Structure formats: C-alpha cells, structure tokens
Regions:
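Conserved helix/coil segment N-terminal to the catalytic DExD/H
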Residues: 1-14, 25, 137-145, 162
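Homeobox/homeodomain signature
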Residues: 2, 13, 38, 42-47, ...
C-alpha cells in the first residue's frame, strides 16, 4: 500500500525496508524519490548484487551484524546426493528429541515423491502440506497447526522462506536443492536453529552426474559458511 500514489504521510521521518532483496528497484526508487528527506534503513541477510555493490563503493553506508542472538548454536549443514537411509536418519533423529521438521521442495509437483518416500520407509510421523496454490486461509491453518505442535512435519515449497519462527523445528530437509538459488537456500536454512538447540539442514540433490559443477559448488558454499555470523 505504500507504493500507491494516493497515500500521503504528513511527517514521515524513517523508513525501514526488511527483506530488502524482495523489493524491486523501481519500488525502492519510488519511495526514495517521493520522500527524499527520510532516513532509509534496508535490512537483508542476502542483499541483491546492486545493493551490495553500491555499499562496497561507498554510495550507501553499510553495517554488518555479526553477533548472533544469545544461546544460538551453529546449524550443521550437509550436502549430499539423496539416499533413503539419510532421509530416514534425519527424521528419526529429530523425532527422537521431540522436535519438528521442515521438508522443502522446489516445485509443487515434487510433493507426491516426498509422501511416497515417507510411506515406503514406514515413517510414523504426522504431517501437513503447504504451497502457494492453496487458499490463504488453508495455508494459515496448516502453519498454525505446525506452530502449535499438532503435527511433526511440514512439507512445503519455499513459501516458508521468511516470516516463520518455530523454535521447536530444528531439522530442515530440502529435496532437489540444486534447483534453488543460493539466497533462497540461505533464507530457508534460517528457518531452523532459532533456539538453543542444535539444528540440522540436509541439502539433498540429484546424482552428481545429473547436475553441473556450478550447481554443486553453490551448495558446497552454503555448507562451508555454517558458523554463526558467517556470510558470503
């Protein structure tokens, strides 16, 4: 609504843009041009190249937050070709400590495969599904049931990329992770490890014969930068 021309502010002094990478250049320029005197703060864990370059060139002031919240523990990140035994182990380890699990796929059409794997492995877990094609009220109901601990596992697309804070969910399993962008993976990994418990992220990918070296290197970069306060 801020981008509508018929909305006016009498004395707007400060504008904070969270998740800055999700806004387009035209949207940000519109606000800057319309309110040239305001103090503007942009927040992002994964800044777009244009914003990062302007900061490094000194055209924008840059501050880096390196201190994590107290009691946080680094997320253990594993990159590997998908194997049923790894999937089984990841789920059983989290369930054994009464935790919850995010399972993420890049496309809605991949969800049936995950469900079939759960059945093949006889995994006794309760789960719900969430994706962008569902009605908004249905998505909210699924998220609420997961947040309240009524189900153990949430299978979804990357709609959980931001705005989700569930401290009891400390295992993230991503299928076909090579189909996600690096910033998407970074944001998704941030859905776990939001308490004082050790969190785990499993980035499953296709056979190394089926993905190119660049995609594999991208995944490995994320695994290498798993310490608290690290970035790329």
């Amino acid at each position: 609504s801020l981008f509508k021309k018929d909305i006016e502010f009498n004395n707007l002094g400060t504008l904070i843009i969270d998740e800055e990478q999700k806004f387009g250049v035209d949207q940000k320029e519109f606000l800057i041009n319309r309110y040239p005197q305001i103090h503007l703060f942009s927040l992002s864990a994964t800044p777009i190249p244009r914003t990062l370059q302007m900061s490094l060139l000194g055209l924008k002031e840059l501050s880096i937050i390196r201190t994590p919240p107290s009691n946080r523990i680094a997320i253990r990140t594993y990159v590997q070709k998908y194997e049923q035994v790894s999937f089984l182990t990841a789920i059983n380890n989290e369930i054994s400590r009464n935790g919850q699990i995010f399972i993420v796929v890049p496309r809605i059409s991949h969800i049936p495969f995950v469900e079939s794997e759960i059945k093949k492995l006889n995994l006794d877990i309760s789960y719900r599904i969430g994706h962008s094609k569902m009605k908004e009220k249905d998505i909210e109901e699924v998220f609420l049931s997961f947040s309240n601990g009524e189900i153990q596992c949430l299978i979804s697309t990357n709609i959980i990329e931001s705005g989700i804070d569930i401290k009891n969910a400390n295992t993230l399993i991503i299928f076909n992770s090579n189909l996600f962008g690096l910033s998407q993976l970074y944001q998704l990994r941030g859905r776990v490890g939001r308490s004082d418990k050790r969190a785990y992220a499993y980035l499953f990918h296709d056979s190394e014969k089926l993905i190119n070296k660049t995609a594999l290197k991208k995944l490995q970069v994320l695994a290498n930068y798993e310490n608290l306060g690290s970035n790329f």
